[in-house]
Amino acid sequence: MQKTAIIVPCYNESYRLKAEAFINYAKNNKMVYFFFVNDGSIDDTLEVINSLCRSYPEQMHCIDLKQNCGKAEAVRQGFLKAFEFDFNNIGYWDADLATPLEAINTLCSLLDRKQIKIAIGSRVKLLGYRIERAPLRHYLGRLFATCSSYMLRLHVYDTQCGAKIFKNNSDLQNVFSHPFNVRWIFDVEILVRYKMIIQDKGLGSLENYALEQPLEKWTHIQGSKVKIRDFFLAALELIKIYRM
């Protein structure tokens, strides 16, 4: 595996942040580094992150945002910090580990292919795969993904899974160079920005450079900050991206 940075945005995650899981993974994967971004948490998240980083400083780093900026900006700040180092790949991962850390290896293996620049985890319920989602969330998610694919001409099955890794290059740095226009569906805006860069260069379709990987395991974790009403806010943001 090439040298990889994983951004982990954290807002009030003190009870859900699985320190032992991160440490065990880091011990067995010396080429993976974690950047935990404390997004102005008002609980003990910062203390948990600092304790985690002290216990394994070689591969774990803390970025402390004094004010809550939202997940989109927290992820972006993490990428900007990672750009200061010589990482081959940079991605982001949900702090609750709904997607197991072992999937990092799977996504990174996709980036070993010459032309692939984007590796996306996808929650596809296949035979023998353990994808545990609440039915209502699943159907709302499928509706949103279908609308996104149709409106933005992005043939992506699952835009919102919080497990994505990218090759570190000038295009990626351009994508993250300025704040996102949306708060909830920045995952979609990332792909749209990348698509526009590729098109401006005359390099064809984003589909030539991105791969979705069905995850073997994904588990809905209690305490999610995403509410049903947020799907309606996401629809409004989708229109905003469409007008970019």
Where are these regions (language model features)?
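Hydrophobic helical membrane-anchoring modules
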Residues: 1-2, 177-244
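Short beta-strand/loop segment that forms part of the nucleotide-sugar
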Residues: 8, 22, 31-41, 63-65
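Short, well-formed alpha-helical segments that are part of the catalytic scaffolds
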Residues: 12-27
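Acidic helix N-cap motif at the loop->helix transition within catalytic regions
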Residues: 15-19, 43-52
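Alpha-helix termini
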Residues: 25-29, 52-57, 81-88, 195-207
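A conserved acidic beta->alpha catalytic loop
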Residues: 38-47, 97
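Acceptor/aglycone-binding surface of glycosyltransferases and processive sugar-polymer synthases
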Residues: 65-84, 89, 101-184, 221-223
